[in-house]
């Protein structure tokens, strides 16, 4: 386990927080949302990597390296970083990383290391998908002593709403929710059973490459969740998890209350991240509850910056399609040349 690097100097971070990278102000707590790439903002990327490793390591995961930055973060066509910035304390509250998929075979998807995508998923879903990952809140904003901590996750949703407005072609959100090895097995199994019961993947779109065997066919769970509807069984789930001295992970709770058509996939172990257990999920953007859309995707006060960023994503999307077209033309040309050689 390597020692985590020292914090990056505030002045270096602030120098990279230029106006064109700001998306919006948050609905609460007076914070700000920025997006950038590692190439654009190396100091911010370094600080994000430090804070991610610190937060994940404390929870029982992490890479074990001095900073959590991988090849997908730094690739030219890799992930964008979204951060919540506290202008009062001049520090990063938390963040996500995301990538906009524009084809059935996008590059640098973290989920492809652990999940197998069906042809249907690649063809009908991936080209219209935003992949999310590495959601974190820095340790200082996980305590009750910090008055802004209660808004940290809500602020991240403000940022996600802005990214969806930036990318109107996106119809799906795809990613993973994480549970750490310290999470009690009985609580985990009850939660996963509940998720699969109410948010099943009936089309078999995504499967774990090495899924965990969770024994979810045990009749115990049918007997346990005896309520007549989602709400009643949700209360039973809360009670069962509290009985194990655990709680529903905040991100899981947030996703469950975002859309009624969420889909839940297999759970896998991630050996590259402290053997945490990760469950794949998919959300359909048009099905997000109207009140959530109104809360997180409104335009007031941030229209100008979004216009500039939307144009950037549009150009990147066109460039990506051009690259795909050229690759297809090159393959067709090579195939034609091979055919001519055989004829000779």
Placement of each model-derived feature along the sequence:
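Short, cationic low-complexity segments
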Residues: 300-326
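Short catalytic/ligand-binding loop motif for oxyanion handling, primarily in non-cytosolic enzymes
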Residues: 92, 140, 181-186, 273-276, ...
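A short helix-loop-beta-strand connector motif used in the catalytic cores of GNAT acetyltransferases and
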Residues: 73-83, 262-263, 273-279
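Long, continuous compositionally biased terminal/linker segments
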Residues: 85, 280-309
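Conserved N-terminal entry element of GNAT/NAT acetyltransferase domains
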Residues: 1-39
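Short, basic, low-complexity termini and linkers enriched in Ser/Thr/Gly/Pro
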Residues: 327-344
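Acyl-donor binding region in acyl/amide transferases
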Residues: 63, 103-262
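Short amphipathic alpha-helix that is part of the acyltransferase structural core
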Residues: 24-74, 78-97
């Amino acid at each position: 386990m390597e020692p985590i690097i020292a914090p990056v100097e505030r002045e270096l971070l602030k120098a990279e927080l230029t106006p064109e990278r700001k998306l919006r102000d948050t609905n609460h707590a007076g914070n700000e949302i920025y997006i950038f790439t590692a190439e654009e903002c190396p100091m911010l990327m370094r600080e994000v990597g430090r804070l991610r490793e610190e937060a994940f390591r404390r929870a029982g995961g992490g890479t074990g390296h001095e900073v959590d930055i991988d090849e997908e973060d730094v690739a030219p066509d890799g992930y964008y970083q979204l951060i919540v910035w506290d202008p009062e304390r001049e520090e990063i509250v938390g963040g996500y990383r995301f990538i906009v998929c524009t084809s059935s075979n996008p590059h640098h998807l973290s989920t492809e290391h652990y999940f197998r995508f069906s042809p249907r998923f690649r063809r009908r879903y991936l080209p219209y998908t935003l992949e999310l990952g590495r959601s974190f809140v820095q340790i200082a904003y996980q305590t009750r002593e910090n008055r802004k901590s209660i808004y940290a996750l809500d602020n991240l949703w403000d940022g996600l709403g802005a990214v969806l407005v930036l990318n109107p072609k996106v119809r799906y959100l795809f990613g993973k929710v994480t549970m750490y090895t310290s999470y009690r097995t009985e609580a985990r199994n009850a939660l996963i059973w509940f998720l699969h019961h109410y948010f099943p993947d009936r089309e078999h779109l995504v499967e774990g490459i090495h899924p965990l065997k969770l024994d979810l066919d045990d009749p115990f769970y049918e007997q346990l969740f005896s309520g007549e509807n989602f709400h009643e069984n949700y209360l039973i789930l809360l009670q069962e998890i509290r009985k194990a001295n655990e709680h529903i992970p905040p991100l899981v709770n947030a996703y469950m209350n975002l859309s009624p058509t969420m889909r839940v996939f297999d759970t896998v172990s991630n050996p590259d991240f402290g053997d945490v257990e990760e469950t794949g999920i998919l959300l359909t953007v048009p099905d997000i509850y109207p009140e959530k859309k109104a809360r997180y995707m409104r335009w007031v006060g941030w229209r100008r910056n979004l216009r500039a960023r939307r144009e950037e994503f549009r150009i990147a999307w066109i460039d990506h399609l051009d690259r795909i077209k050229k690759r297809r033309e090159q393959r067709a040309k090579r195939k034609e040349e091979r055919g001519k050689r055989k004829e000779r």
